[in-house]
Amino acid sequence: MERRLILWLDEISKDLLPLVGGKAAGLGEMIKAGIPVPPGFVVTSEAYRRFVFETGIAGFIKHILEETIVSGRPEEYEKASELIRSKFVRTPMPPYLRRAIVDAYRKLGTLVGVEEPRVAVRSSATVEDLPEASFAGQQETYLNVKGEEEVVEKVKTAWASLWTARALSYRDSLNIDHETALMAVVVQKMVSSRSSGVMFTIHPVTGEEDKIVIESIWGLGEYIVGGKVTPDRFVVSKSDLEILEVRISRKDKALFYDPDLNENVEIKIPESGEELEDLRRKHPAVAEVVEKYGIRPDAPSLSEKEVKELARLAIKVENHFARPMDIEWAIDFELSPPENILLLQARPETVWSRKKEEAEAKPPEEEAVPEGEVLVRGVPASPGVASGRVKVALTVEEAAKKMEKGDVLVTKMTDPDWVPYMKMASAIVTDEGGMTAHAAIVARELGIPAVVGTGDATKKLKDGMLVTVDGSRGVVYAGAVKTEEAREEEARPELGAAVAEVLSEVYPVTATKIYMNLGHPEEIDRYKHLPFEGIGLMRIEFIISSWIGYHPMYLIEQGRGVYFIDKLAEGVAKVASAIYPRPVVVRFSDFKTNEYRRLKGGEKYETLDERNPMIGWRGVSRYIHPNYEPAFRLEVRAIKKVREEWGLKNVWVMFPFVRTTWELERALKIMEEEGLSRGRDFKVWIMVEVPSTVFLADEFAKMVDGFSIGSNDLTQLVLGVDRDSGFLAKMGYFDERDPAVLRSIEILIEKAHSQGATVSICGQGPSVYPELVEFLVRRGIDSISVNPDAVVRVRRQVASIERRIMLERLEELGSRLSRL
């Protein structure tokens, strides 16, 4: 079988990948999983190999590459590509290869009941869709191809597309040997697309695994991959297929097949009856489709039912391949629902699968939190921050003349031909496109910050302007918002990248999330490459005592409340930007009365003489009291500033020392009055330190998204032991492993999970007691947050425990089956 020239999609599996390429292997696997795919066949890589070796093209390619590509400049790639591709075009197809392709095309016509069916001819390179390398459109696709001779020529042209300048440059950037690159070609029945698009089973920008992102446009899908139209975007929850986010873009043009002209035509989507009549005069068949389906520039290109059906298919694809996937799809107006939804391609999502986002992103330092003038806003497409001089280029030729290393490339859109110039850029800004456009995908892979879909960047930004592009927030600022220290660190990206890459391979993935505790914002630079999923506890007390130094009520009295807000926001943003998009759970202040008194100006406001501040006026009881509520509002405003003004939506909050539901309800109301409310991207947690939160966990769970166990305080209050008493500790009373404490944790997890809330732990216990970690994992805790020095050790321990649990369950299952 390995030497066959033609294979049909329904006889292909991933085992034949070297013969059929990634695209075809993915299609074959989807067919096996019962997923709707247009019928077709594959001209295998064996046919390509015979063509290039029997005609002498292979030797010609080797000679051209050695002689032409010397320094890696874009012009060298262009010259080599032109020579090689013209050689393909001039070389006739050997008769036996032509016969094999024609016979398969005729058979496809018989299968679909059309003598000369319209087909899509798509490249399927043998390394194109592997997890290690996403070529995202590096080779060509030809749509609505009809007739035997045309199909044969397009197969040959698809083979030649293995040698475009962009493909050559891309393989070099990933150190892929050109001699190992082979090309298969997929020939499929053409879909008559009413709508088409791309979807990811992981959020392509934030890496959230519980979301599906669907982008769609009218007509054929080439305009979404090429970024020629800014697509509609739908974000769907995997758990219940609820549509979480909808963004309808203006889609003023589309590509449709015109049967009267037998070619694809670009149309202006009509907004009025007059424009529809004009379209009917030029392209009557296309106008009929536009009118029948209510196609308008501002109308949604998908119905709610279609969004959910696409999401359902996406989950089915991900489950079959057992990894996040990047999927192309189309809706055929010639078919009836639900058979009209067809999947055209599925390949492994590459960026988050390699876990290189943290290493490749360039997060701002403390001083680099953007405060400059906002010039342009768009869709955040590739995370990171970079500064440079603007070069506006509307064509590849213009980019070739203007671009220098480190420039900010500004253009209407970037298709695959732009890759050599994207590699030269420090950042990319486009007028059009969405987060799944080709430009966004490649920018993420290359680690280049990108903002797409701005609408007018090419008009607002001028050549030579110094700007800062924040790809995480979708904003372009005036000037270079960076420090020299940040520049020096970015000049040595290989250090952080190397550490992150090593860690991603050495330390295992766990079902139980491993978070890290952090108190000093400056420490994040030392620890950001550790293998943790987020900050499970960010204490702000250090920021207040060291960065601010004053009692917040004193600052309010002096009219300097904004100073408190800004400094607290800076400290939080430093951490959140450094690990974006991983979450940062910020705990509101939890000073005791005596600690607040030590702040400058504190004596005036902390007059309460408490014998035991540990269980006194602290936590939420302080936030809702008139004597401190104005200060709490400053904390809330700082969080709002970080999330809304600076776009760091990965910042969540946590209330400490919660005693009752009514006090939490009042604190949440204050937060809402300041413009912060729980939502899909804003989680609210509470600390579990007081036994009342354990017993009433099911009630608290209706008000919050998660719980975090403060095991030190919880142990103190469950056992009635002063945590600071060395005398009682020596007697063995203070022990987080005490059965009463463990039972409290068990009750909490059961009650929280029954209401859909998550449970974490941020106390010292897991860092000290391995047996406590095992207890927590076996009880189903969602995450464990530990100090930086324990992250690696606890992650390994959790992975080991989870493996043991899996083996135990398999043994139990085997035992049950043996008794049947």
From Swiss-Prot:
<keyword id="KW-0808">Transferase</keyword>
<dbReference type="InterPro" id="IPR002192">
    <property type="entry name" value="PPDK_AMP/ATP-bd"/>
</dbReference>
<dbReference type="Pfam" id="PF00391">
    <property type="entry name" value="PEP-utilizers"/>
</dbReference>
<dbReference type="GO" id="GO:0008986">
    <property type="term" value="F:pyruvate, water dikinase activity"/>
</dbReference>
<feature type="binding site">
    <location>
        <position position="711"/>
    </location>
    <ligand>
        <name>substrate</name>
    </ligand>
</feature>
<keyword id="KW-0418">Kinase</keyword>
<dbReference type="GO" id="GO:0006094">
    <property type="term" value="P:gluconeogenesis"/>
</dbReference>
<dbReference type="Pfam" id="PF02896">
    <property type="entry name" value="PEP-utilizers_C"/>
</dbReference>
<dbReference type="InterPro" id="IPR006319">
    <property type="entry name" value="PEP_synth"/>
</dbReference>
<dbReference type="Pfam" id="PF01326">
    <property type="entry name" value="PPDK_N"/>
</dbReference>
<dbReference type="GO" id="GO:0046872">
    <property type="term" value="F:metal ion binding"/>
</dbReference>
<feature type="binding site">
    <location>
        <position position="587"/>
    </location>
    <ligand>
        <name>substrate</name>
    </ligand>
</feature>
<feature type="binding site">
    <location>
        <position position="710"/>
    </location>
    <ligand>
        <name>substrate</name>
    </ligand>
</feature>
<comment type="pathway">
    <text>Carbohydrate biosynthesis; gluconeogenesis.</text>
</comment>
<dbReference type="InterPro" id="IPR015813">
    <property type="entry name" value="Pyrv/PenolPyrv_kinase-like_dom"/>
</dbReference>
<dbReference type="InterPro" id="IPR018274">
    <property type="entry name" value="PEP_util_AS"/>
</dbReference>
<feature type="binding site">
    <location>
        <position position="689"/>
    </location>
    <ligand>
        <name>substrate</name>
    </ligand>
</feature>
<feature type="binding site">
    <location>
        <position position="539"/>
    </location>
    <ligand>
        <name>substrate</name>
    </ligand>
</feature>
<dbReference type="GO" id="GO:0005524">
    <property type="term" value="F:ATP binding"/>
</dbReference>
<dbReference type="InterPro" id="IPR000121">
    <property type="entry name" value="PEP_util_C"/>
</dbReference>
<feature type="binding site">
    <location>
        <position position="713"/>
    </location>
    <ligand>
        <name>substrate</name>
    </ligand>
</feature>
<protein>
    <recommendedName>
        <fullName>Phosphoenolpyruvate synthase</fullName>
        <ecNumber>2.7.9.2</ecNumber>
    </recommendedName>
</protein>
<feature type="active site" description="Proton donor">
    <location>
        <position position="762"/>
    </location>
</feature>
<dbReference type="InterPro" id="IPR036637">
    <property type="entry name" value="Phosphohistidine_dom_sf"/>
</dbReference>
<feature type="active site" description="Tele-phosphohistidine intermediate">
    <location>
        <position position="438"/>
    </location>
</feature>
<feature type="binding site">
    <location>
        <position position="712"/>
    </location>
    <ligand>
        <name>substrate</name>
    </ligand>
</feature>
<keyword id="KW-0479">Metal-binding</keyword>
<keyword id="KW-0460">Magnesium</keyword>
<comment type="similarity">
    <text>Belongs to the PEP-utilizing enzyme family.</text>
</comment>
<feature type="binding site">
    <location>
        <position position="713"/>
    </location>
    <ligand>
        <name>Mg(2+)</name>
    </ligand>
</feature>
<keyword id="KW-0067">ATP-binding</keyword>
<dbReference type="InterPro" id="IPR023151">
    <property type="entry name" value="PEP_util_CS"/>
</dbReference>
<keyword id="KW-0547">Nucleotide-binding</keyword>
<feature type="binding site">
    <location>
        <position position="689"/>
    </location>
    <ligand>
        <name>Mg(2+)</name>
    </ligand>
</feature>
<dbReference type="InterPro" id="IPR008279">
    <property type="entry name" value="PEP-util_enz_mobile_dom"/>
</dbReference>
<dbReference type="InterPro" id="IPR040442">
    <property type="entry name" value="Pyrv_kinase-like_dom_sf"/>
</dbReference>
<dbReference type="InterPro" id="IPR013815">
    <property type="entry name" value="ATP_grasp_subdomain_1"/>
</dbReference>
<comment type="function">
    <text>Catalyzes the phosphorylation of pyruvate to phosphoenolpyruvate.</text>
</comment>
